[in-house]
């Protein structure tokens, strides 16, 4: 990658102090890069990913027609995973870890994570519940209420952060199902890296795609992990997209452009 391109992918100095502050209170850091669609095929080949070994998933989001939850930094998502498993997630992004209740921090279902992308980062709080793939499908198809897919803790977290007009069970159950989006998730363990790689290919109904490569690490390993990932990708000529955005942001941009 040319030096000028590297400059665009560095986190601005003004944000470094904030990042260091957030890292101290985070549970984990996920270093990510998004690859432009024109380079997907070459990237998958160069990093050694076998598409046949990828795990298929279906991802659903739940929001209002105007995406009011997303605009308030709140996301409700459910996933169906190959083999009959699934999960539901209520995520707040961005979040200041210092403002999170200690009771919530002690829950093994709640995590503070930093997504670090070229040029920036975002800190999020995620409340997760495991469920079956059928439970996800039933809620997505309206056979069961969305609230039945969430735990009491998730419902409380939702109510605390949703807009007042939405933050109760009645309005929660009236949210639209957005999706599904089809996802292929692959895991790699290159010999050149101390940590494994996760590769996710998100396929949108209009034919567009989002390819993200990431590695997860402990907060005190973040800068080392980022440098190692960039070195690994540079050595293989992987092109980094000029506009970096999270998978959720890409999905919501799609849904905003294709409102019912």
Model-derived segments and spans:
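Phosphate-end processing signature that detects enzymes handling 5′-triphosphorylated RNA
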Residues: 2-260
């Amino acid at each position: 990658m040319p030096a000028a391109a590297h400059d665009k992918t560095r986190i601005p100095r003004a944000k470094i102090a904030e990042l260091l502050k957030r890292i101290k209170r985070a549970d984990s850091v996920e270093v990510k890069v998004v690859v432009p669609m024109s380079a997907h095929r070459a990237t998958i080949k160069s990093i050694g990913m076998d598409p046949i070994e990828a795990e298929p998933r279906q991802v659903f989001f739940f929001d209002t027609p105007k995406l009011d939850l997303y605009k308030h930094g709140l996301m409700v998502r459910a996933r169906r995973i190959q083999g009959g498993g699934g999960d539901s997630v209520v995520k707040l992004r961005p979040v200041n870890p210092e403002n999170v209740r200690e009771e919530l921090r002690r829950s093994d279902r709640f995590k503070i994570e930093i997504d670090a992308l070229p040029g920036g980062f975002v800190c999020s709080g995620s409340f997760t519940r495991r469920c079956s793939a059928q439970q996800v499908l039933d809620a997505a198809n309206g056979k069961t209420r969305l609230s039945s897919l969430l735990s009491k803790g998730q419902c409380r977290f939702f109510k605390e952060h949703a807009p007042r007009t939405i933050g109760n069970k009645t309005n929660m159950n009236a949210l639209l199902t957005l999706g599904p989006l089809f996802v292929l998730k692959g895991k790699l363990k290159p010999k050149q890296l101390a940590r494994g790689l996760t590769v996710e290919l998100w396929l949108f109904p209009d034919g567009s795609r989002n390819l993200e490569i990431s590695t997860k690490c402990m907060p005190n390993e973040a800068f080392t992990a980022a440098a190692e990932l960039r070195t690994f990708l540079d050595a293989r000529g992987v092109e980094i997209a000029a506009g970096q955005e999270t998978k959720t942001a890409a999905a919501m941009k799609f849904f905003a452009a294709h409102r019912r």
